[in-house]
Amino acid sequence: VLALPRGGLPVAYEIARALKLSLDIFSVRKVGHPYNSEYAIGAVDNLDNQLCNEEEIKNIDPRWLEEEIEKQKQEAKRRAAIYRQGEQALEIKNKNVILVDDGAATGLTLRLAIQSLKKMETKEIIVAIPVTPKRVAIILREAADKLAALEIPEFFQGAVGAYYEDFGEVSDQE
């Protein structure tokens, strides 16, 4: 079970515990829009992979975008080091992977993680998330081998947090 930190960790922990599977992280960071940091225009991971929404970045200052991408890559690497505490990443080549997040509003971070995991020659990628809009579910189903989502609303409320009673930020310590 691979969690996208930080929000995906509590969800992934419960899945790993219930299925008696190993738990690790896959450190991916959202690149937020300069005027609304919660809206993803791209994603980066700790392995220096990146994915951007080409339509969204057309009107973004390229210098700002380059700096933001680099900043988020460094943060992804920092988090990977913190969460692993010197331990090696799980060996996932030729393994089935359950990729978990707390939800997917745009799907960019999960799509990047899927692309990166495919490069690592995983056997099967199953995305497990509590909620995602219908249009994103379609994209994730095409990108991954399987999608398990508890809710796929036709009319998404705009943010993953709207589907939680308590959507407090998960700290690095937690």
Where are these regions (language model features)?
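PRPP-associated nucleotide enzymes
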Residues: 1-174
